Amino acid sequence: MERGAPFSHYQLPKSISELNLDQHSNNPTPMTSSVVVAGAGDKNNGIVVQQQPPCVAREQDQYMPIANVIRIMRKTLPSHAKISDDAKETIQECVSEYISFVTGEANERCQREQRKTITAEDILWAMSKLGFDNYVDPLTVFINRYREIETDRGSALRGEPPSLRQTYGGNGIGFHGPSHGLPPPGPYGYGMLDQSMVMGGGRYYQNGSSGQDESSVGGGSSSSINGMPAFDHYGQYK
């Protein structure tokens, strides 16, 4: 697949002196060329000025690495699927153009506001302005989560207590919030929860005592662990 020249504006044009050297030099060198400037008083003395070649960005440096492109594409494909070379290059050029497009728009905003650093808000603003509104909300959630993780990591390095983090599953999506202590004890102190409370109405009883005979609850008996009566959760099915 032959590519065009989407990044041709990155190539620096040759200067007038370099064009004259290319036209009048009989033995041009590919790397450097020299210009001999004669001295005003002595014709034998001259100053050799080395001319550097024009800085032209290589094509492979203008695109996202193909290995990264293939890795991202394979995440959404089954293991037995194959990707042709032209498909890889098409996605590579598309992703590279997209990055350049959004970054250029964000850079213009920074220049108007006389700022040197492009922030995440600049990228989101540029994407919204260019019509990529569907990406703004998910990326906003991602950026907020990323900043919270970085804040917790910095607190851990400084020895500060991290915030309460409850992670759901293995995908890294979690809830971050302030740490909370135990709730205040009830009128009977810290005790065990009666089964009648689980069924929709009951009370807290200190030391797990419900005020009833154990044999009358579900018709079963419960054992004692460390001096505390343990409730038989399956007594109602006996």
Swiss-Prot record:
Q: Per its UniProt record, what Pfam families does this chain match?
A: CBFD_NFYB_HMF
Localization per record: Nucleus
* Keywords in alphabetical order: Abscisic acid signaling pathway, Activator, DNA-binding, Nucleus, Transcription, Transcription regulation
Ranges for the region named Subunit association domain (SAD) are 91-102
Tissues where the protein occurs: Expressed in green siliques. Present in etiolated seedlings.
What are the start and end residues of every segment in region (Disordered)?
Answer: 203-238
Disulfide connectivity? Answer: none
Residues of the DNA-binding region: 64-70
Q: Which GO terms describe its biological process?
A: abscisic acid-activated signaling pathway; blue light signaling pathway; embryo development ending in seed dormancy; epigenetic regulation of gene expression; positive regulation of DNA-templated transcription; positive regulation of fatty acid biosynthetic process; somatic embryogenesis
What effect does gene inactivation have here? Altered response to blue light (BL) and abscisic acid (ABA).
List all Low complexity biased stretches.
208-227
Q: Which domain of life is it from?
A: Eukaryota
Q: Which CDD domains match?
A: HFD_NFYB (cd22907)
Instruction: Kindly state one GO CC term assigned in the UniProt record.
Output: CCAAT-binding factor complex
What PROSITE patterns does UniProt report for this protein, alphabetically? Answer: NFYB_HAP3
A GO MF annotation of the entry reads: sequence-specific DNA binding
Quaternary context: Heterotrimeric transcription factor composed of three components, NF-YA, NF-YB and NF-YC. NF-YB and NF-YC must interact and dimerize for NF-YA association and DNA binding. Interacts with PRN1.
Q: Which family is this protein grouped under?
A: Belongs to the NFYB/HAP3 subunit family.
What's this protein's function?
A: Component of the NF-Y/HAP transcription factor complex. The NF-Y complex stimulates the transcription of various genes by recognizing and binding to a CCAAT motif in promoters. Acts as a central regulator of the embryogenesis. Required for the speciation of cotyledon identity and the completion of embryo maturation. Controls seed storage protein genes through the regulation of FUS3 and ABI3. Involved in the blue light (BL) and abscisic acid (ABA) signaling pathways.
Protein name as it appears in the record: Nuclear transcription factor Y subunit B-9
The protein's organism comes out as Arabidopsis thaliana (Mouse-ear cress)
User: Which gene is annotated as encoding this protein in its UniProt record?
Assistant: NFYB9
